[in-house]
Regions:
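Bimodal "functional hotspot" detector
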Residues: 1-152
């Protein structure tokens, strides 16, 4: 066998593998169904704030993306040493984004106090902080619990 044929036999599989890798990277970038966010939670027994990276499904519209993020945030942290923002069973009833303001409605379970979650004022403050930090198009977050606007 000629020297050039041997080189081609070695080079051809490497070329095919390189093209396959490049194609898979492009397809992953285009079709990646997840968006990476950084969420902030308090720690049990301290005033420290820690971050947690979370993958949230990509949605078609900006408003739906904020809704998916908020739903995931309200579910609480994945790490047991971090405090959920609200009591167990709290859900997002609505999430509307208009003119740089997010209007977020939480179920009445957010009013329940538990040692297993942050206090209500801290939970609302952390909810606002998380949304504003992850979505640069949103400047203000107004929170409603059981359809009544609350400050935090």
């Amino acid at each position: 066998m000629k020297e050039s044929t041997k080189k081609q036999l070695v080079f051809l599989p490497l070329l095919i593998m390189g093209l396959a890798l490049a194609l898979s990277a492009v397809l992953y970038a285009v079709r990646n169904p997840w968006h990476r966010y950084v969420m902030f939670f308090g720690e049990y027994g301290s005033d420290k704030i820690y971050s947690e990276t979370r993958l949230v499904s990509k949605e078609d519209t900006f408003q739906d993306q904020v809704q998916a993020f908020t739903d995931s945030l309200v579910l609480g942290p994945r790490t047991n040493r971090f405090l959920p923002l609200f009591a167990s069973g709290t859900t997002v009833e609505f999430c509307i984004v208009k003119d740089g303001t997010a209007y977020v409605g939480l179920s009445e379970n957010a009013l329940f106090f538990s040692e297993e979650c942050a206090d209500i004022k801290t939970g609302i403050s952390m909810l606002k902080r998380n949304i504003v930090r992850n979505f640069t198009n949103i400047d203000t977050v107004e929170v409603y619990i059981d359809s009544i606007q609350v400050e935090g």
